[in-house]
Amino acid sequence: MRTLLLSTGLAALVAAVGPAMAEDPSTDPAADPTQLPPVTVLATRSETRTDEAPATVTVFTARQIEAMLATDIKDLIRFEPGVSVVSQPSRFGAALGTTGRAGNEGFTIRGLGGDRVLMVVDGVRVPDGFVFGAQSVGRGGYADLDLMKSVEILRGPASALYGSDGVAGAVAFTTKDPADLLRSGESFGARARVGYNSADEGVTTSAMVAGRGGAFSGLLAWTGRDSRETGTQGSVGGVGSARTMANPQETRSDAVLLKAVWDIAPGHSLRAGYDWFESDTTADVLSGRSASVLELLADDETRRHGWNLGWRGDRVLGLDRAQASVYAQQAETRQFTFEDRNPAVDRTRDNSFDNEVVGFAADAVKTLGVHRLTIGGDVSETTQQGVRDGTVPPMGETFPTSAFPKTDYALAGLFVQDEIGLLDGALKIIPAIRWDSYDLSTADDPLFPGARADQSGDHVSPKLGVVWQATRTVQLFGNWAEGFKAPTPSQVNQFFSNPAFGYVSRPNPDLSPETSRSLEIGARLREVDLFGGRFSGQLAGFRSDYEDFISQQVVSGAFTPADPAVYQFVNFTDVEISGVEAKADLWWDNGLSARFAAAYAEGETTSDGVTTALPTIDPLKVVLGLGYDEPAGRFGGQAIVTWSQAKDAADTDGLGCFNADPALGCAVGDDFALLDLTAYWNVDDRVTARVGLFNVFDETYSWWSDVRGVAATSAVLDAYTQPGRNVGLSLALRY
């Protein structure tokens, strides 16, 4: 299957190059991208202004990422209500407990996260998350922001254009191209940057070079980061479970990007890329020490590398545009833990989770009168395997072993979208539909002791978007979409047996896909005269219904050796979420600007006939900003206030927090307000210095996404707090 995918994809690319070279050269010069308004490709698979998209999309450009002094995805969404990233403190164990082991776990969009949010890097899916026992693998640590040209976040189902996993939303990372470093008419460009963040004593160093010669251009980029543990506001040190200071930790990461572009003819190009990411984190988990555990050490490694070959042609074969790509990616995570015990024998855990994928994708655009058709498809095959190893295994087990068998996971899909322009383009109706198939094929695996099962199925995902430019300044939009998520290999075939303690976990080949239906309706104002400046804003409301959510449940048994409890992943939960989001910008010709953003949502989950509040939704969050950019562009800055409401205690029912007094329930945090300051100085046209002062008033606070599930009576709540007052610095040089 892999050989077939690669050979078919390469053949398609080669076939496309010939017609491209025969096309008439285009006389339209490329527009300067710095003069264009923010655009999204994620929303409609074609470049669309974010204020003309039928759904809410946020685009972070490389310049914005640098201006925020963001070093990871949690920094990236710092000022983005409605989106969060779970990142708990490292307080895990060797055989039990996963708190903080996954690092930045991934994005949560409008209350749902994990594998329910599609994440791609240059169109290639980020590997699944995985949790089993003390092993926990997140999805937010596979890419380095310094290498990104843009990051797009789409709210709402994305399956009609992108297939499985786009149940709650999608996030697309796009890496830099040679043209991003090369100024018009120049044949060479370079950039170097150093940065520092006191929150984790992190030092970032990056270097990029790009060159152009004739029809060829290339890019070589590298970023290295060294950091320690992210600080907390906890004051209890020492060893043991009462510790609230962050456990000592050191992280080293390196990322490399190579790109080569051949401009075959004007508007037609062939490009090849290779990217490599590596991260190594060592931790001394002092909070895990006790009278019986003398030392707890961890070493976690993440590796991802991939290559891609793509072709794009404008006005080829009678089409407005066509593009195709073939790609391969390998991702490996390894989590090693050593536990020095007394009097028990020392033990280790050496767990891995590996993903290898190859794929091919293509799409084309054709305008026919008032119709702008986009049609395309993609196919991929992922080989997924997880191995549990170490010493002193649990009673009844032998190492090495696997929680699920080695699985080939194939996805294929075809889609069509029609952008219909009516009323001289003032009204756009955008229907789309996609058919997807999925197939899980297991292989004989000597490390998997259970009975294995294969599974396959298909799904159809429609959507309908509408954008109406009612007046020059007023726009109405709406988007109805369905999403789906196919079961993962570990959900279908997870197996574990511990008869001595009376429980087992068994495969379930009858799992159905998770599905969603979402409606978003909103209004936009664009460049309205207000207070002597120009005002733009958006107000949107949404309602989403999710069915057949997959969760692990006890389906039978009595927790005895004779009648063990049987755990199984089943379609168990239905979810309803509704909310409202708003954002606005006001700016003046003298360089002053103001911004506002807010998001509020509520939801409920129904499991086995019992309805409770959905605890994964973030509480109300409001962001207010005031900025100044000197008209000549030499210097500027922002003051940003972020206010977050405490979680309603009634919304934590069903979280399962353990308390000495059950009436106290789960921790809900407090209302808090933060002030962050950022500033920049363009020393000249080649040197830019930036500084940020975050949490200016040294507020003690926790994000709900991090403290969720912790008991209200916990003595270590301060361990989940964010850093106090901290500084970020950056110096960039361009040539």
Segments predicted by a language model, with ranges:
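Flexible loop and strand-edge segments within Gram-negative outer membrane beta-barrel domains
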Residues: 247-249, 267-322, 330-355, 390, ...
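Membrane-embedded beta-barrel scaffold of Gram-negative outer-membrane proteins
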Residues: 228, 319-339, 477-481, 510-570, ...
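Short acidic/polar hinge/loop motifs at secondary-structure boundaries
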Residues: 107-108, 125-155
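A beta-strand signature from Gram-negative outer-membrane beta-barrel systems
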Residues: 141-191, 734
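Gram-negative outer-membrane beta-barrel transporters
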Residues: 25, 422-423, 427-429, 436, ...
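Extracytoplasmic beta-strand/coil segments of soluble accessory domains associated
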Residues: 74, 78-125
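Outer-membrane beta-barrel domain signature, especially the mid-to-C-terminal portions
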Residues: 245-249, 283-287, 294-298, 335-337, ...
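Transmembrane beta-barrel wall of Gram-negative outer-membrane proteins
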Residues: 198-227, 237-281, 303-313, 421, ...
